[in-house]
A protein has these predicted regions:
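Signature of Gram-negative outer-membrane beta-barrel scaffolds
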Residues: 1-59, 74
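Gram-negative outer-membrane beta-barrel transporters
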Residues: 13-19, 28, 114-116, 121-126, ...
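Residues that define the transmembrane beta-barrel architecture of outer-membrane proteins
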Residues: 2-4, 45-49, 100-104, 111-113, ...
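Transmembrane beta-barrel strand/turn architecture of Gram-negative outer membrane proteins
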Residues: 45-60, 147, 166-175
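Outer-membrane beta-barrel proteins
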Residues: 1, 9, 39-43, 92-96, ...
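A generic beta-sheet turn/junction motif
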Residues: 12-16, 57-61, 70, 110-114, ...
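Surface-exposed extracellular loop regions of Gram-negative outer-membrane beta-barrel proteins
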Residues: 27-34, 43, 55-105, 116-117, ...
């Protein structure tokens, strides 16, 4: 597997509000040689444009931020190597589809004297999720939704006395549901 990527973005300021549209280009070349099938050679190339837009605004001593971005993950070399794990499963090769997603996030971050904080909510719509497990072939599972909240804070005790440590705390809540899809398996 070989990959190259590049991006362009622009910051547009409207007073305290900043808008940042951007575009990322990903180029992937994947090859597979199956030596157990007479050195069968497969090749697949992809060029993908991934748009995104983010915003931020300084309000009341904090920063509100958010964005919507397109995500893309091609099948890994490891998934391609063991696609046909198990008997009686469909033949597969480089026809495994890439995962695509829309990633949305909104949150606030700031500083209150001895406390840095950040709270964000997120929602991710994933299409063609690549999934596997014991006795299961890597296949495109289907559509999956994930959403949750991330909270992070740093207590800056070193501001009180230089010998005191800063203490960081983080928490993430994640809820995921399979909206549409089936796992193909040999497990009875």
């Amino acid at each position: 597997t070989a990959a190259a990527s590049g991006f362009i973005s622009e910051s547009i300021d409207f007073g305290p509000f900043t808008l940042r549209p951007g575009l990322r280009i990903e180029i992937f070349e994947q090859e597979r040689v199956d030596r157990l099938a007479g050195s069968l050679y497969q090749d697949k190339s992809l060029v993908v444009a991934l748009p995104g837009i983010a915003f931020s605004s300084n309000i009341m001593g904090g920063t509100i931020f958010g964005g919507i971005h397109r995500g893309f993950t091609p099948p890994s070399s490891g998934a391609l190597k063991i696609l046909n794990f198990g008997e009686g499963l469909e033949e597969s090769g480089l026809d495994l589809e890439a995962e695509k997603s829309w990633n949305k996030e909104i949150g606030i971050r700031g500083n209150l004297s001895l406390l840095d904080y950040e709270i964000a909510g997120f929602h991710i719509d994933i299409e063609n999720l690549v999934a596997a497990g014991r006795g299961t072939a890597f296949k495109n599972l289907g559509k999956v939704n994930s959403q949750g909240i991330e909270v992070r804070s740093d207590f800056l005790f070193s501001k009180l006395a230089s010998f005191l440590p800063n203490i960081g705390v983080a928490y993430t809540y994640l809820s995921t549901s399979v909206v549409d899809g089936t796992i193909i398996s040999n497990i009875q």
